[in-house]
Amino acid sequence: DKELADNDMVYKLAAPSRMKDISWIRPGKVAWEWWNHWGIKGVDFEAGINNETYMHYIDFASRHGIEYVILDEGWAVNLKADLFQIVPEIDLKKLTAYARQKNVGLILWAGYHAFARDMEHVCKHYSEMGIKGFKIDFMDRDDQEMVDFHYRAAEIAAKYKLMVDFHGTYKPTG
């Protein structure tokens, strides 16, 4: 078992990468508000889904060398239907600029249905804003349509230099 971590069989058997340029991919750690339900204590602002809370997380990430902050469910008005209607408590352009100054990237949570509906437009729009990736959730099945979605989402996200965290997805067993 101790040799499992050193096993290079996947690299030896996998097809070569289809991506020519991977220089934009920056793996890293993530600060994530979902674990504590935005419940920050001892601050001089009302914690919740708002700029002040996310700026607090960005500051924390910057101080501790954490590369990303995820804005989990709640940043958009209706995440099942539309990823372009942001709640009024969040100014995403301001947050993205603030995070950039602190050398922290932002990743947005997105429900599968809303992301799949217009993923090309979603990826283009948020990439241009400076977002670094998406955490896509609630795929919850493993049929061919869903497998195809994963490939399509990865391809389109890569086109716009966005990383993807497939969350709530099937186990890739082959």
State each model region's role:
Residues 1-101:
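Conserved structural scaffold segments of CAZyme catalytic domains across common CAZy folds
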